[in-house]
Amino acid sequence: MVASGSGGRLKPLVWGLLLALLLLRVVLVACMPLQPAGADPALLLEAASSPELPLELTGTLLGDPRSSVGTASCRALLQLPVGRTELRFGDCPPLQEGWRLRVRGRLRRPQASPHPLLAAPAERLARQGAFSQLQVQDFNVLERPATPVADLRRRMAQALVRQAGPDRGGVLAALVLGSAVVPVPAELREAFRASGLSHALAASGFHLSVLLGVVLPLGARLPQPARLGLAAAAMGLFVLLAGPQPSVLRAVLMGALALAVLESGHRSRPLGILAASALALLLARPDWLLDVGFQLSVVATAALVLSARPLELGLRRWLPGWLPGWLAAATAVPLAASLYTLPLQLLHFGVVPLYAVPANLVVAPLLTPLTLGAMALACLAVLLPPLLPLATVPVDWLCRLLVLVVQAFAELPMAQWQLGRPTPVLVLLLSLALLALVLPALGRRWRLLGLGLLVVAVAVHLSLLGADQLLLVHQGRLDLLVARHRGRAALVSSSADGFSCSQASQLSRGLGVQRFDWALLLDPLAPEQPDCWRAQAGLVLASADGSLPLQPGQRLASEGLSAAPVAIESRAMELQLGRWRWLLLPDRQALWAWQERYGPGRGGFDGLWLGFRPSQRERTQLQRLGVERMWLSGAIPLGWPETWAASGPSGSLQAVRG
């Protein structure tokens, strides 16, 4: 009896240890830096002394060429015998997924991110197994093999877009195929994101549940093998159309396990099925642990399993009795998902869609019939094309209503609450705090502990946001300087092009800046996208005809932040944030003009930024200033003093006070 009891206690311990070892393996493999394989063309760049290399490659397209957001270029992924590379075209050529090509062009390394808050091609491509880019100069199509799945997707998407237009047609196609397969117009996609409805366009468990909700009742009277075969066919078709994305495979695997458990006569345990599905996928692909879509999919599903029902019961007690009972159930689902995914949204985006719960509540009655309608239209596009125009009319009305609701929520004040991206430690504290507050099995003591952790995390994050900070981001010819004082922020940019504005927008979201007080553009050329810059700052000063945006005697200022020119006919500026005084010298002419006016020995600055590489003589002169910090944009020169800092070819520097 003793031996039997001991064995019974030992068995859970062994299983727990095995599970911990598996999870440890997944984490270690996922966190290992991705490297190109032995014969990957990226290795040729490492051996070459030039940043670019003329090269000819042969491979298979992994997708149709797609326009890059915010640029006029076009890109597609090419599968090589070993490894992958991204093809870059000036204009999108009429090429299709599955075609074999011979391409000639210049191979280069994808640009790395200069700052953790900025997205860059290098990180995006590494997750796709590519470590190089080829700027295509010429190409030949070698083979056009049959690609029935890609042709089916393309036919469905083109038919829906042709009938309902690029906006609503893109939404209808995304409801069937997912936004990862069908590009939705950028402005509309941003509206879905701002309103907290991005999940509606991403192929996920919701779309699979809608599909199975139609298929399973149709096979209810069939024998069990036929019933399971029908469900398996529906799930297989879903994977074929939406593609083997992490969130899609998670939903399908979880649905298959749940169906198998129910058909075997056992009681389904959703949390166990979710854990088993996620673990199985991570064992096969450990890198998916860092995939944002997979993280959000698993966490949102866990929220529905663990807390949707308790939240519904709590809302029923809290809401007035005259409100309909279904309101509590309808509110509990998006509320649980929003609470559980809040740490991930802050970690990855630094933005919270403030109206996500009411937006989901309003569109909930539309999504299921609209998804079913879109699926029916996709089938008609393939099976009975002549009926498609007539059948599209009612579905298009529903889609028009959905788009209007999404745009209305996206245009509300503070639709995207930019709190900034907290440090991973604060995200961990926030996660623990929310779990202690929302898990129904925990008692009052845990709730008080969670509330305390929440207060600590918020207080620390707000103190970091309120400190005086200066951030330099350097990337190629781009320099961005973000000055912050007590939660306010101002921007100085060396360039006024659209890419610089896009980078500034990403920085503002990640830093928790709703809007810059002012933006000073030192580029002698007029801004490429003035509307973009005006959206970033309350006041934008830029050159219109090659003249300087600020003349001597003028001053650009807001509370605790100011910029003023320090020399005639130059871009030399004095930047003040709080009690800090920084001298900004974007080019050598600015240094000469400043020295001509004040002489080489004038100091009194806390820091100095150089946008160019100084000569040895200039370094000696600058050392006499005795500034606390000396920053350089670019690579570290030989003989550079150890106390001075350089951003590197693509990097950033940051100073914090208070």
Regions found by a protein language model. Name each.
Residues 1-7:
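N-terminal Lys/Arg-rich, disordered targeting/topogenic segments
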Residues 12-24, 134, 184-356, 373, ...:
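Hydrophobic alpha-helical transmembrane segments in multi-pass membrane proteins
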Residues 15-199, 502, 506, 518, ...:
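Membrane-interface helix/helix-cap signal primarily in integral membrane proteins
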Residues 59, 105, 175, 204, ...:
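Divalent metal-coordination and catalytic microenvironments
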Residues 91-106, 117, 123-125, 130, ...:
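Non-globular, low-confidence helical/coil segments that flank catalytic cores
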Residues 137, 175, 180, 205, ...:
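Fold-independent oxyanion-binding glycine-rich loops
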Residues 148-164, 171, 188, 196-197, ...:
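Hydrophobic alpha-helical segments of integral membrane proteins
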